């Protein structure tokens, strides 16, 4: 299966990262440091959930002798690679806070649709039991990032529109090898994208508030 075939290129849409009127009412006003702390904690928790779900899927469905080969093939491409988002801490430190928030919002929003179907794929009682909460947690993190953008937008120039890479849905036919590899690839990309968001938020929080014990 060719890299990139897990996703539909027709689903790429241009998104304007404007915030809806009245959105502020859904997220309480609080000090900027608290907004960053809450966003970092949410991103950390989601990244942990993504990593645990990926490992449990691998342990349950992917034979051990095939994991290295499959990782090399399915991890070759994620749609998030089509946007100029920083790939690590050093790259992130070269971007402004507003740029990092825009990239974070794009990455989070790209997973909202597929994550609505995650719980329909994983019906057992393993770590997949948390999958029905992932969408809700993504929405919470989206609101947190939007709240930060509202706080900072008056001080930063508005950036260009970004392409929002929208991932395909998870495949429910787990008896198919192609479906297994597709879902394996999606979970790998989800884990990578959440790691990026967590890194961006930590970089912003550390440099803005001068924390001496930052772990990124």
Curated annotation (Swiss-Prot):
Zn(2+) binds at residues 45, 198. It is found in: Secreted. CDD domains: somatotropin_like. Disulfide bonds join 78-189, 206-214. InterPro entries: 4_helix_cytokine-like_core (IPR009079), Somatotropin (IPR034975), Somatotropin/Prolactin (IPR001400), Somatotropin_CS (IPR018116). Growth hormone plays an important role in growth control. Belongs to the somatotropin/prolactin family. This is Somatotropin. It comes from Meleagris gallopavo (Wild turkey).
